[in-house]
Amino acid sequence: MGNAATAKKGSEVESVKEFLAKAKEDFLKKWENPAPNNAGLEDFERKKTLGTGSFGRVMLVKHKATEQYYAMKILDKQKVVKLKQIEHTLNEKRILQAVNFPFLVRLEYAFKDNSNLYMVMEYVPGGEMFSHLRRIGRFSEPHARFYAAQIVLTFEYLHSLDLIYRDLKPENLLIDHQGYIQVTDFGFAKRVKGRTWTLCGTPEYLAPEIILSKGYNKAVDWWALGVLIYEMAAGYPPFFADQPIQIYEKIVSGKVRFPSHFSSDLKDLLRNLLQVDLTKRFGNLKNGVSDIKTHKWFATTDWIAIYQRKVEAPFIPKFRGSGDTSNFDDYEEEDIRVSITEKCGKEFCEF
């Protein structure tokens, strides 16, 4: 590297440091003093179900006063309690209302009633990366790299705030109108300074240390990034089997096979991310995220331009208008039932 290039790199590293320090200040203000709830169910017109889960659903809604479309996550308090997800749900709201990054979906409103908790987020009409990946089969390496770069920056941001994401997978990545990623579902995100022990995540994406019930840290997100890049570029995940237990055996074995079309740079990066030995896993070493950002596979990536959303996306989802749902699957519709008496008031008093 010439002196000028070295100086430029140095100033970029400094400006990232400054940016993250300021971001932490902004985050902590909102983390310590969460915004009060600022809407009610009657403010929204419900349009269509976009997805369902074990304790709720996500619906497309229209804000009556502004006519803006949003995605409303509706969680049944009693089901959340039954499934022991109180802590996770409170975490999700508290984190979402405090973060601010170009590739994180924004929480616009939150409120609760006798039966449910509601989180109203910006609506991302392009649908899940998952459905586009399954339709196309696999992404070219430049296409996969464009998405991977956004996740790297997002994890760099989250980790600087002591947040572990813990749920990376193509189903949780939405493609926006400009073809960029919006990370959604902070149900497993957690603020952790040291290690944590909770078993959570998706079998194919779990790091070996989670499976082995060891205390784990942010490095689990870098492992999951390796799984995601592999799945984007191959069309299938690196560890798969019919039963979770068989998947876990493959993950802890530390053996990965690569398709012949993977470039040698890609294989090298993945060997360093899908590294069972934590003392060798990229993202977890003394240089932190810079081992990933300066890796040869990312040589062509302009990190600042990605952050500024100035890079042309390899794919723009098709959709007609802001309330179009054609990129989402159809689900059976169900009425939102609200009890006349308050359920689980104590458990969710801080929501």
Curated annotation (Swiss-Prot):
One of its GO terms (molecular function) is ATP binding. The gene is PRKACB. Residues 44-298 form the Protein kinase domain. A lipid is attached at G2 (N-myristoyl glycine). Residues 299-351 form the AGC-kinase C-terminal domain. Mediates cAMP-dependent signaling triggered by receptor binding to GPCRs. PKA activation regulates diverse cellular processes such as cell proliferation, the cell cycle, differentiation and regulation of microtubule dynamics, chromatin condensation and decondensation, nuclear envelope disassembly and reassembly, as well as regulation of intracellular transport mechanisms and ion flux. Regulates the abundance of compartmentalized pools of its regulatory subunits through phosphorylation of PJA2 which binds and ubiquitinates these subunits, leading to their subsequent proteolysis. It is an enzyme of class 2 (transferase). Keywords: ATP-binding, cAMP, Cell membrane, Cytoplasm, Kinase, Lipoprotein, Membrane, Myristate, Nucleotide-binding, Nucleus, Phosphoprotein, Serine/threonine-protein kinase, Transferase. The modification Phosphotyrosine is found at Y69, Y331. InterPro entries: AGC-kinase_C, Kinase-like_dom_sf, Prot_kinase_dom, Protein_kinase_ATP_BS, Ser/Thr_kinase_AS, STKc_PKA. GO terms for cellular component: cAMP-dependent protein kinase complex; cytosol; nucleus; plasma membrane. It comes from the Eukaryota. Its EC number is 2.7.11.11. PROSITE patterns: AGC_KINASE_CTER, PROTEIN_KINASE_ATP, PROTEIN_KINASE_DOM, PROTEIN_KINASE_ST. The active site is at D167 (proton acceptor). A number of inactive tetrameric holoenzymes are produced by the combination of homo- or heterodimers of the different regulatory subunits associated with two catalytic subunits. cAMP causes the dissociation of the inactive holoenzyme into a dimer of regulatory subunits bound to four cAMP and two free monomeric catalytic subunits. Interacts with PRKAR1A and PRKAR2B. The cAMP-dependent protein kinase catalytic subunit binds PJA2. Interacts with GPKOW. Asn-3 is deaminated to Asp in more than 25% of the proteins, giving rise to 2 major isoelectric variants, called CB and CA respectively (0.4 pH unit change). Deamidation proceeds via the so-called beta-aspartyl shift mechanism and yields either 'D-Asp-2' (major) or 'D-isoAsp-2' (minor), in addition to L-isomers. Deamidation occurs after the addition of myristate. The Asn-3 form reaches a significantly larger nuclear/cytoplasmic ratio than the 'Asp-2' form. It catalyses: L-seryl-[protein] + ATP = O-phospho-L-seryl-[protein] + ADP + H(+); L-threonyl-[protein] + ATP = O-phospho-L-threonyl-[protein] + ADP + H(+). The modification Phosphoserine is found at S11, S140, S322, S339. Pfam families: Pkinase. It is found in: Cytoplasm; Cell membrane; Membrane; Nucleus. ATP binds at L50, G51, T52, G53, S54, F55, G56, R57, V58, K73. This is cAMP-dependent protein kinase catalytic subunit beta. Its main location: cytoplasm. Activated by cAMP. GO terms for biological process: negative regulation of TORC1 signaling; protein phosphorylation; signal transduction.
